[in-house]
């Protein structure tokens, strides 16, 4: 493996009703099974929320980089990610899917779609996921 630019290690104990924390103690999160999946409705986070948070931040940063490299660095995109757990017919379990909603300003719809496509090709999360999960991207301009 090439020498990493950055690395982090997160440890999980207790599965979906447990906790996750970083080895350097800068991150800690209690977890709970969502009510929709048989949980007790506790307001703790879950793996899908953490995935959506990471993906939305990473994609937004990739898009900001693409915009800045094209002298549009003053535009502040908004990216939301909805994570889905879907039935997996292959093994009877579940699989992950994601929908990205990207909003840009001060450009045409066609320009926005071009920038979002470039960001999708640049974003580390997208690179890791686009061949393994279903990803839908919606682009809008305000």
Curated annotation (Swiss-Prot):
GO terms for biological process: response to oxidative stress. It comes from the Bacteria. Coiled coil: none annotated. It holds the Pfam family OsmC. Gene3D superfamilies: 2.20.25.10, 3.30.300.20. Belongs to the OsmC/Ohr family. This is Organic hydroperoxide resistance protein-like 2. The lineage of its organism: Bacteria, Bacillati, Bacillota, Bacilli, Bacillales.
């Amino acid at each position: 493996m090439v020498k990493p630019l950055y690395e982090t290690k997160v440890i999980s104990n207790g599965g979906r009703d447990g906790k996750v924390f970083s080895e350097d103690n800068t991150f800690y999160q209690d977890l709970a099974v969502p009510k929709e999946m048989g949980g007790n409705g506790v307001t703790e986070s879950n793996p899908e929320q953490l995935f959506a948070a990471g993906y939305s931040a990473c994609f937004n940063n990739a898009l900001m980089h693409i915009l800045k490299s094209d002298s549009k660095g003053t535009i502040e995109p908004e990216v939301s990610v909805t994570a889905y757990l879907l039935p997996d017919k292959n093994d009877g379990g579940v699989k992950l899917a994601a929908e990205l909603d990207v909003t840009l300003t001060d450009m045409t719809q066609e320009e926005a779609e071009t920038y979002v496509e470039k960001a999708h090709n640049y974003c580390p999360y997208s690179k890791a996921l686009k061949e393994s999960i279903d990803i839908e991207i919606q682009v809008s301009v305000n």
